[in-house]
Amino acid sequence: MMRLLCLGTVLLLISPLSADGPRDNDPTTVRRVPRLGVDVPEEDVTKLNKGLDELAGMIQRVQQQGDQQAMSLLPDVMIYHRAVKDNLEHQEFFAPGDIQKAHRVLATGIERARQLIGGHAPWTSQTGLVVRGFISRLDQTVQPYGLVVPPTYRADGESRARVDIWFHGRGETLSETSFIDQRGRQAGQYTPAGTIVLHPYGRYSNAFKFAGEVDVLEALEHVKQHYRVDEQRISVRGFSMGGAACWQFAVHYADRWFAANP
């Protein structure tokens, strides 16, 4: 019995030492995350590239016009181009349905660009599901986030809205395209009355750490700039991986939240 106990102790001591060996850093043996996506039919590739070129031209047109208001809202358009372009280039459409999402996302981006060129930005005062974007101070990339704006919210009103940040769970196939499409079509399970719900993307599924952590803070600041927010009523919430993120933000930034609900 004593020998078995000693052997068990030795194995327990050895296992952590070998848990992160050289093989864990070999890209040929470590499981790819995310997995390689499906092959995209040539017809879809052609159509998506044509749409990307059209949207890129419209973005350039807004930039050339030099209107400061339009320029400040351009990230709300650029997120659609970046998502589809990157996911197409890196083969990050994981099911045939993702390809259809890309077509929808691209169409929305083109429509927004058309509105912005015409001097309009109706999504900025829209209630319900709204997808917005900001330029990261870390690497100057455009990053998306989703909002659920309550029907009672008025941009020109006097009252300020509570904001709940909802951290999404782990999803190895949650590309930017899928996230943007989801946030434009699904409110999620948590929509408290009179509350703006902020859904950060957080750079895929890194538990909202590293650049994902900074993205959350920047997304919140962007919301404060564009919406009437009650800064005394901002909370963090989440489930699964999002619950871990909630704990992290509750501990690291305890003075910022009136509640934390992992």
Please identify what each model-predicted range represents.
Residues 5-16:
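Bacterial N-terminal signal peptides
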Residues 42-49, 71, 75, 96, ...:
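Soluble non-cytosolic domains of exported or imported proteins
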Residues 20-38, 90-161:
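A domain-start/cap signature at the N-terminus of enzymes
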Residues 21-77:
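Amphipathic, heptad-repeat alpha-helical segments
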Residues 70-95:
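Amphipathic, non-membrane alpha-helical rod segments
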Residues 47-54, 61, 76-83, 101-108, ...:
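Charged, amphipathic alpha-helical oligomerization/scaffolding segments
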Residues 158-227, 258:
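Active-site machinery of serine-nucleophile hydrolases
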Residues 132, 232-262:
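Primarily recognizes the serine-hydrolase "nucleophile elbow" in alpha/beta-hydrolase
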